[in-house]
Swiss-Prot record:
This is 5-methyltetrahydropteroyltriglutamate--homocysteine methyltransferase. GO terms for molecular function: 5-methyltetrahydropteroyltriglutamate-homocysteine S-methyltransferase activity; zinc ion binding. One of its GO terms (biological process) is methionine biosynthetic process. Zn(2+) binds at H641, C643, E665, C726. It is an enzyme of class 2 (transferase). 5-methyltetrahydropteroyltri-L-glutamate binds at R16, E17, L18, K19, K112, R515, C516, W561, E605. HAMAP family: Meth_synth.
Amino acid sequence: MARTHIPGFPRIGAQRELKFAQESFWRGESGEPHLRGVARELRARHWQLQQDAGLDFVTVGDFAYYDQMLNLSALLGALPQRFGFEPKTLSLAEYYELARGNAAQPAMEMTKWFDTNYHYLVPELGPQTSFDGGVEWLFEEIDEALALNLPVKPVLIGPITYLWLSKSHVAGFDRLSLLPKLVIRYARLLDKLRQSGIEWVQLDEPALCVDLPAEWLDAFSAAYEVLGTSGVKVLLATYFESAAEHAPRVAALPVAGVHLDLVRAPQQLDAWRAALPAHAVLSAGVIDGRNIWRADLGEIVESLQSLQAEFGERLWIAPSCSLLHVPVSLDAEKKLDADLKSWLAFATEKLAEVATLALALRDPAAAEPALAATDRALEARRRSSAVVNALVQKRVAAVSSAMAERQSPFAERNRLQREALGLPLLPTTTIGSFPQTAAIRQARAAYKRGELRALDYLQRMRTEIEIAVRKQEELGLDVLVHGEAERNDMVEYFGEQLWGYAFTENGWVQSYGSRCVKPPIIYGDVYRPEPMTVETTRYAQSLTQRLMKGMLTGPVTMLQWSFVRDDQPRSTTALQLALAIRDEVVDLEKAGIRIIQIDEPAFREGLPLRRADWAAYLEWATRAFRISAAGVADQTQIHTHMCYSEFNDILPSIAAMDADVITIETSRSAMELLDGFGAFAYPNEIGPGVYDIHSPRVPGADAMQRLLERACEVIPAERLWVNPDCGLKTRGWPETEAALANMVRAAKALRAKLAARQADELTA
């Protein structure tokens, strides 16, 4: 009989209870006992959902107060030494300082979790890292679950993935040299789990699904030779891609089972069936853990029947990966179109799908009603007239190569733009959004509830726009933005105005820490029926003589940060989005807007995990961006923004996007991203972020000037812009104004310094 489990469950709560408890704690409105109490209630609720669904295991260890990698660093005792915290007595206040920074130290670096929109905190390791152990919150959670008489399966990120995703700031240091000490700590953790009565532990090694060097693979084997004999059974979990080439290696190790992502990489199954020894468990990840579409259970049952015949009780059924990446439940969706809702499955519904698959193998007749309901919903989706739009299909078919090219090369455009825009050396700007105050959020909520008339809402938003414009003028910024007061989310705002999109009331997903996003659903062909931002941007420009940027979200980010239809290639959906955004760019230019920013912070996260698959993605992704941007005259300056992106290895494709100006996140990584731009001789203009907006810490003007001077060593000052790392939506006005004042001060000081140097050279 097949067994059932999940790799992980969303931690935020169906009503974002964790987010609100975190933020209350940060504001000092509640203490650690309240936060711990909310966390305990959420864990118990989520375990009960798994138990009620009939799963054979409940997963423990997927909860984190901020991030699972930070939790693991705390458990291992591998905290950044610069904070001076004692790992074994780490408080929640100190834990959050690691994530958010404090007056003395900037936050730990944050970056994307593989190719998802979740962010993790990058471990900081070095020769001094000892892995002597730290706070054992995991064991407290296991005790909670055992006290509820639940069948516990703990989950930990595995040692190879932990090291692979870490960084060292010590030149020449090999992180892999830490593995022997790290394995000793893991072995002790597994032994403690054994003593707690745990039978199975899930060790997540998604790093096996990327292009690991040979020495890392050898290190993996050495590590699991030890960990596989710890006395607790190890389920080695891979996900997000195929790990087929490692099947013989894993089969030779003393691991008790392997979990495979058979949604993203169904082709790997044959290799694993051939390699796995007779005792090994195969956990089949057959329910999509990263998208929200209802699974074709009938088709999956057919594929599982042969696996059951081969593996029997050694077959486990699961989602492809942790359900962290999907919303908690459809129960709260009262306004969603009934047909569309019937096509969906969120985390709680996916628990039922897993259980139904196991039931269908065990008792086909008992599962028949559920399977029949699924078949009806999927057939209705296939036949729906809401999915295919003939107008969009015709336009996509008419796209030409010329639509992806600007009128002139960058050098000529740049000359014309300098003449037209008249900007100083090192022009200052921001990335787009300004603080979303309580007044803004309350007005938007009242408007959505029907308690505020459209005209009154428009006037309130215009008041906020004027406030933002006046503050920017007072600060002395060169290129202004309208502040995006009217926007709840950079994707949702546009999706609400496009055909082919749908929106949930409560479909929240954790992005990082307390930051939750509510991805829209692309269910059909995408089309822009009317302008989306033109009137707002035109109004903002009317308030000032300075240049006002139009602010749009690019096609790749619209795609990456949505739940995307799975019935056509993602490249086709990206092209539809590009055409919609192209129309908006052209209309902004007609309205007199001379600088238009098309944000693509998610560009790199769309990369396949395997380098061999990159070229195809980069071709259609860069083409989509160019199509969105190329409909304007040479004098119109196109900006793009990328944050949390490590893209030195795809710089040719970044250059191929042909944006006139790119702004990037660099402050947390001390401008190291710029080294690649310099070595590549990136031809266009660039704005390296000079301060980290994700921390409340206000950096001084001197610190920002030093970063700019470092940037000038790599990129000529004539091609540099000065800006924060990212938008300022989540910050408060006092810290925002203080930081921007220092940023402008730094830019002016460096301008003066460079001018003086130039004068000295002329007189020498």
